[in-house]
Amino acid sequence: RLANALAHVGEGRIVQVSPGPIITSYEFEPAAGVKVSQVVNLGDDLALALKSASVRIVGPIPGRGTVAIEVPNAEAGMVYLREIFVSAEFAESKGRLPLALGKDVNGVPVVGDLTAMPHLLVAGATGSGKSVGLNAMICSILYKATPAVVRFLLIDPKRLELSVYEGIPHLLAPVVTDTKEASTRLRWIVGKMDERYKALQAKQVRNIEGYNKAVAAEERLPYWIVVVDELADLMMVSAGAV
């Protein structure tokens, strides 16, 4: 149907199809003499022909001489965490704290590295998958890192999402569910952060990786990750303290 819909703009061919979980991307190579603008301006017409809510056209793609046509799938595909874990992108990741983030529009696994961020805000509407994404990131790190490499401080005032991790050896402290205790724990972790900055300064290094290379094995520092579920709610209750 897509080929038929494109036929009236001139000759060309679809050279690649990349199915993703949400959309399928088609690379269309216009024949000589066909203007790219003719294809790019066809979004609404293609959506009507394909009976789709919308069609996104991106082009031209540098170095390929093609235009990408992104068509929403009739049903969104499920992306399983295991698929990302067994992928080459995750298995061969050089990141110290790899995050399995999902798949891109072409169905290729997307893996991030928390140490390269190092702050991360997950935002979205209710029911959009924020908690699922957060749990996937935590599991990604737990999958690869031992307690000697990474430790967590988990703050969960609503007691709904992070309590499942209670008792794992990676915790700096029991999962925090009280807002007052959360403020205390955050002040504590900030104090510890200042101590670490002084330790890095003493060794004349810029990060934990550099510090761990400069000291003996028994003196190495683990990464510390603070995870706060529903940060906005915590700030409303304890705005001054947080």
What is each PLM-predicted segment?
Residues 1-27, 33:
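N-terminal anchoring/assembly modules that precede and organize ATP-driven motor systems
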Residues 8-18, 54-60, 150-151:
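Short beta-strand elements
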Residues 120-121:
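Short hydrophobic/aromatic beta-strand immediately N-terminal to the Walker A/P-loop
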Residues 130:
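Conserved lysine of the Walker
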Residues 133, 137:
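Hydrophobic positions on the alpha1 helix immediately C-terminal to the Walker A/P-loop
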